[in-house]
Amino acid sequence: IEKLDPGLFISLSELNNLRRKAVELLEQKIKENPSHKQMDETDYSTELKLPQNKSTKTHNSKEAYLIDDYKKLNQLLLEKKTINKDYKIIYELPSAVNIVEKELFDLLNQNPEVTLYFNSILMQNDLEASINFVKKLTDFSEREILCDNTGLAFELKKSGCRIILGPNCNIHNSWNLLEYKESLEPSGVIPSLELDLSSIEKLSIPENVELWYPKKIRTMLMQSRQCLV
């Protein structure tokens, strides 16, 4: 690593080749040194146990609509009351929630059944503004919040809000789902969008945790882990 030039770009395929070569060299050294003691896996055992897998095929499905337009939100709320249909309404807020107009805030405040969606938040001032925005709502501790930011999830969970962890929390296996359950106690989760349906069906879902999955979702460039690499 010390011999690499500063600013050198290495493609993902080349990184994989280097990894494979490193594994081959390590395996060769182990064969050449019979006295080498392999690690005893029992020394690193854990008391964590996965919950029994609950088949996602037997669950009752519910519909949810994700929108980010004030007029559509108002229309959807009126339609829901008119037809008396049971579905969730999720409203995606901008990262800079301080620009939210009073008219929209009042509508969200008057309809506590609307789930608020906070996308990934990178700046500290945006994070603090999001926390303050939620706390200004009437009976905010009873709100359901969908968020892709674990810091925001942690702060709002302390206030009593029901938390749904979004796809950017990168829930990709049963173990990190269990860790999130222990640390943040979410009411529901959306697995990583990198997982296909067959992988999601194999997840061990903890008790009192709803499994959400988007049928359609807007994805952005440079968002996945592969793009970031």
Where are the regions a protein language model picked out?
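Non-catalytic helical/linker scaffolds that mediate oligomerization, partner binding
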Residues: 1-229
